[in-house]
């Protein structure tokens, strides 16, 4: 019997994986740079803080990594507050666990 459920939001509950690439691409575009596929591949194995240091160095940006990270996180936060949608069937699935009084986090 299931005793509890721990969810991973990105890509499981929410259709949200593309926002990180969009936020990074926008951050670079505002500085006249283009996010390439190889950088995307490398960045997705990093934490956001590591990623901001990586793009600062790789693209020779003058802004501090903390400024880049803040800009990226503002865009990601806007997405979660205003645009993120549950993946198909998620609401019913979660409601089913709730109806069975199974704790979720």
Predicted features by range, described:
Residues 1-42, 99:
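Active-site neighborhood of HAD-like aspartate-dependent phosphohydrolases
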Residues 17-18, 49, 91:
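Alpha-helix N-cap/helix-start capping motif
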Residues 21, 25, 48-53, 65, ...:
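An amphipathic alpha-helix signature
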Residues 36-37, 52, 88:
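Short, hydrophobic secondary-structure boundary micro-motifs
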Residues 45:
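N-terminal phosphate/diphosphate-binding loop that engages ATP/GTP or pyrophosphate donors
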Residues 55-92, 100-102:
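Metal-dependent phosphoesterase signature
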């Amino acid at each position: 019997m299931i005793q509890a459920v721990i969810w991973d939001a990105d890509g499981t509950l929410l259709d949200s994986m593309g926002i990180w690439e969009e936020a990074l691409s926008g951050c670079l575009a505002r500085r006249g740079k283009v996010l390439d596929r190889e950088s995307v591949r490398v960045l997705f194995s990093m934490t956001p803080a590591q990623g901001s240091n990586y793009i600062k160095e790789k693209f020779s940006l003058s802004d501090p990594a903390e400024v880049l990270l803040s800009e990226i996180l503002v865009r990601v936060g806007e997405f979660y507050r205003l645009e993120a949608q549950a993946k198909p069937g998620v609401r019913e699935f979660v409601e089913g666990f709730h109806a069975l009084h199974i704790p979720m986090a």
